[in-house]
């Protein structure tokens, strides 16, 4: 119930017209990055919105060509209590905070004269991890999650698509892949044996 208004606002976000037109055609990448960091996002990256990863049911809904990839850190202490209700609160609580911050960032992008469509973390439109890899924010780990050099897998992800003039970031090899090949902790400890020992296919 608490996240419903955030999800509903995200669904219509792409239809909202900017209150002004862009003052110039200059690149606004760093303006958006600084604003996002100021709001509290720990990771911010820019890349092409790759429609290959969009769910079929959302392909007509997704409007804009650029993806702003955003990650919000999840509380470390609470996360270490998994499995517990405390850890669940950390998980969903971070999504709730992220949803509200996304609305603020979208509002800022519109104030620059551009459209912004929120791909709500509570209403995913596709697979986000490949775009986060392309934006240089991490790599796919053996656990099937995005591993960031700053947060590990302890981050919640969302994307805002836009038509703003931005410059794309580049993929970075953080060495996560090689580390996963030798670590194997998640593979060996997975209760359901759902993870494989073989090399993980990856991009970036």
Where are these regions (language model features)?
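Iron-sulfur (Fe-S) cluster-binding modules
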Residues: 1-46
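Catalytic cores of enzyme domains
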Residues: 42-204
């Amino acid at each position: 119930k608490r996240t419903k208004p955030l999800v509903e606002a995200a669904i219509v976000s792409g239809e909202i017209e900017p209150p002004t037109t862009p003052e110039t055609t200059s690149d606004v990448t760093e303006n958006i990055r600084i604003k996002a960091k100021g709001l509290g996002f720990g990771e911010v990256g820019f890349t092409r919105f790759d429609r290959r990863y969009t769910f079929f049911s959302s392909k007509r809904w997704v409007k804009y060509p650029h993806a702003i990839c955003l990650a919000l850190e999840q509380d470390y202490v609470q996360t270490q209590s998994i499995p517990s209700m405390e850890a669940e609160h950390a998980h969903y609580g971070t999504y709730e905070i992220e949803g509200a911050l996304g609305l603020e960032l979208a509002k800022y992008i519109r104030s620059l004269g551009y459209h912004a469509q929120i791909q709500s973390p509570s209403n995913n439109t596709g697979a986000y991890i490949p775009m986060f890899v392309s934006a240089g924010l991490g790599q796919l780990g053996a656990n099937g999650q995005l591993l960031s050099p700053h947060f590990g897998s302890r981050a919640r992800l969302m994307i805002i698509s836009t038509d703003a003039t931005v410059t794309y970031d580049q993929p970075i090899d953080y060495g996560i892949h090689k580390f996963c090949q030798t670590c194997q902790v998640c593979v060996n400890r997975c209760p359901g044996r759902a993870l494989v020992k073989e090399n993980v296919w990856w991009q970036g």
